[in-house]
């Protein structure tokens, strides 16, 4: 059996507008990923959302993945999901970043794509 954890920078309610809480959320979720790595969990998935105040504060999962790759040894780190919107960015740019991340994580990068909740 394989285990995974999903992280998205969740900050509930009024705390979502507190920049200190955002920092603490990032640190706490990094600790979850490091704990999961030490306990042989297979995957850590990081969501991507923009301009949401009470659901997800994580707008740059690739940055978080770079940090987590340096702090972990075994767990696979992935985006959940990158929404491919040509209006936002050309899909080739996503492919380039995924290939680069795979090198820096020693083949532990997992790229997830699909239609997100806010996709149109």
Residue ranges and their predicted role:
Residues 1-79:
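N-terminal beta1-alpha1-beta2 module of alpha/beta enzyme domains
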Residues 2-22, 86-120:
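Flexible, glycine-rich active-site loops centered on histidine and acidic residues
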Residues 50, 82, 116:
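Catalytic metal-binding/acid-base residues of hydrolase active sites
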Residues 80-86:
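Conserved strand-turn element in the central/C-terminal portion of the radical SAM core barrel
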